[in-house]
Amino acid sequence: MAFAGILNDADITAALAACKAEGSFDHKAFFTKVGLAAKSPADIKKVFEIIDQDKSDFVEEDELKLFLQNFSAGARALSDAETKVFLKAGDSDGDGKIGVDEFGAMIKA
């Protein structure tokens, strides 16, 4: 599992179950349930690097859409509306993508 040693499998399962229905994803609730909100900056950076599929040092909209699938291959894709809300929450400089510092700030917000 990609998050072994960083996040607990049971927490991931519970967090994914809570946002199974389309339109139910709430990034703040997800970060808390999965245990990410309590993690160190180093662990948050490791998670960011996993989510940054193309290794561009940014998480773009297409990567956010598939965010949940980083936690479980069978998880659903986020809806366009959920993806846009998620991007807006994390993109503090308005460049259309989320950098590692923005990601960390969004998790701790």
UniProtKB/Swiss-Prot annotation:
<dbReference type="Pfam" id="PF13499">
    <property type="entry name" value="EF-hand_7"/>
</dbReference>
<feature type="binding site">
    <location>
        <position position="56"/>
    </location>
    <ligand>
        <name>Ca(2+) 1</name>
    </ligand>
</feature>
<dbReference type="InterPro" id="IPR002048">
    <property type="entry name" value="EF_hand_dom"/>
</dbReference>
<comment type="function">
    <text>In muscle, parvalbumin is thought to be involved in relaxation after contraction. It binds two calcium ions.</text>
</comment>
<feature type="domain" description="EF-hand 2">
    <location>
        <begin position="78"/>
        <end position="109"/>
    </location>
</feature>
<keyword id="KW-0106">Calcium</keyword>
<feature type="binding site">
    <location>
        <position position="93"/>
    </location>
    <ligand>
        <name>Ca(2+) 2</name>
    </ligand>
</feature>
<feature type="domain" description="EF-hand 1">
    <location>
        <begin position="39"/>
        <end position="74"/>
    </location>
</feature>
<dbReference type="InterPro" id="IPR011992">
    <property type="entry name" value="EF-hand-dom_pair"/>
</dbReference>
<feature type="binding site">
    <location>
        <position position="60"/>
    </location>
    <ligand>
        <name>Ca(2+) 1</name>
    </ligand>
</feature>
<feature type="binding site">
    <location>
        <position position="52"/>
    </location>
    <ligand>
        <name>Ca(2+) 1</name>
    </ligand>
</feature>
<keyword id="KW-0007">Acetylation</keyword>
<feature type="binding site">
    <location>
        <position position="54"/>
    </location>
    <ligand>
        <name>Ca(2+) 1</name>
    </ligand>
</feature>
<feature type="binding site">
    <location>
        <position position="91"/>
    </location>
    <ligand>
        <name>Ca(2+) 2</name>
    </ligand>
</feature>
<feature type="binding site">
    <location>
        <position position="97"/>
    </location>
    <ligand>
        <name>Ca(2+) 2</name>
    </ligand>
</feature>
<feature type="binding site">
    <location>
        <position position="95"/>
    </location>
    <ligand>
        <name>Ca(2+) 2</name>
    </ligand>
</feature>
<protein>
    <recommendedName>
        <fullName>Parvalbumin beta 2</fullName>
    </recommendedName>
</protein>
<dbReference type="InterPro" id="IPR018247">
    <property type="entry name" value="EF_Hand_1_Ca_BS"/>
</dbReference>
<keyword id="KW-0020">Allergen</keyword>
<keyword id="KW-0479">Metal-binding</keyword>
<dbReference type="GO" id="GO:0005737">
    <property type="term" value="C:cytoplasm"/>
</dbReference>
<feature type="modified residue" description="N-acetylalanine">
    <location>
        <position position="2"/>
    </location>
</feature>
<comment type="similarity">
    <text>Belongs to the parvalbumin family.</text>
</comment>
<feature type="binding site">
    <location>
        <position position="63"/>
    </location>
    <ligand>
        <name>Ca(2+) 1</name>
    </ligand>
</feature>
<dbReference type="InterPro" id="IPR008080">
    <property type="entry name" value="Parvalbumin"/>
</dbReference>
<keyword id="KW-0514">Muscle protein</keyword>
<keyword id="KW-0677">Repeat</keyword>
<dbReference type="GO" id="GO:0005509">
    <property type="term" value="F:calcium ion binding"/>
</dbReference>
<feature type="binding site">
    <location>
        <position position="58"/>
    </location>
    <ligand>
        <name>Ca(2+) 1</name>
    </ligand>
</feature>
<comment type="subunit">
    <text>Monomer.</text>
</comment>
<feature type="binding site">
    <location>
        <position position="102"/>
    </location>
    <ligand>
        <name>Ca(2+) 2</name>
    </ligand>
</feature>
